[in-house]
């Protein structure tokens, strides 16, 4: 009986993630990969491609040591990944100046997301190793997830569904203009 089932919330953009499709595969290979890069790693690709591809890959900011990129499969609107440019899997591998840069970017982007999206809180996470849930176990990165009262984050844990109110392309425009 239909009344026993909850309403359906369609999220067709998730299918490419579930199937393991990499829609960045249509991008050209960088002219020069960074030393130690993994050519199958989307974070290494983002680090190596020129800024002219930032919109295509979702890069909203770069420093000489780090990159800030939109999560293509976000938990909430504004979900960012903050990663070192180098393909490194563990904290001890990362130089202290890079760690400082990453932490400063976390603080800066908390402020920017608060101002731009009116975020009222954040979940900040780092999954080290595949057994800890790292989707890209060889290239560590922080998740910066903005939160709001009533943001229905329960949907992820209860129904495996996320409700994102804004297209990634629109969000990229908004976040690039706040820098």
Could you tell me what each predicted segment is?
Residues 46, 71-73, 85-87, 127-129:
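Histidine- and/or cysteine-centered catalytic micro-motif in compact active-site loops
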Residues 41, 68, 84, 102, ...:
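Divalent metal-coordination and catalytic microenvironments
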Residues 94-119, 169-176:
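Long, well-ordered alpha-helical scaffolding segments within enzyme catalytic domains
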Residues 117-132:
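A short glycine-rich, hydrophobically flanked beta-strand micro-motif that places a catalytic Asp/Glu
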Residues 79-84, 129-154:
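Histidine-centered divalent-metal-coordination microenvironment in nucleic-acid enzymes
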Residues 1-77:
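Active-site microenvironments that recognize anionic phosphate/pyrophosphate groups
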Residues 1-5, 9-22, 147-179:
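C-terminal helix-cap and adjacent tail motif
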Residues 80-104, 157-164:
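Short histidine-centered catalytic/ligand-binding loop motif
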């Amino acid at each position: 009986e239909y009344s026993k089932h909850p309403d359906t919330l369609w999220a067709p953009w998730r299918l490419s993630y579930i199937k393991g499709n990499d829609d960045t595969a249509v991008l050209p290979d960088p002219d020069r990969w960074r030393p130690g890069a993994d050519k199958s790693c989307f974070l290494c690709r983002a680090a190596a491609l020129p800024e002219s591809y930032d919109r295509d890959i979702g890069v909203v900011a770069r420093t000489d040591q780090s990159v800030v990129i939109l999560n293509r499969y976000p938990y909430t609107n504004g979900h960012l990944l903050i990663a070192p440019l180098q393909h490194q899997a563990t904290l001890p591998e990362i130089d202290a100046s890079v760690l400082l840069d990453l932490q400063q970017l976390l603080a800066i982007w908390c402020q920017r997301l608060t101002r731009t999206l009116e975020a009222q809180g954040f979940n900040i996470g780092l999954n080290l190793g595949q057994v800890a849930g790292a989707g890209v176990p060889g290239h560590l990165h922080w998740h910066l997830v903005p939160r709001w009262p009533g943001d229905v984050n329960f949907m992820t844990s209860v129904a495996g569904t996320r409700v994102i109110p804004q297209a990634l392309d629109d969000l990229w425009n908004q976040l690039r203009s706040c820098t």
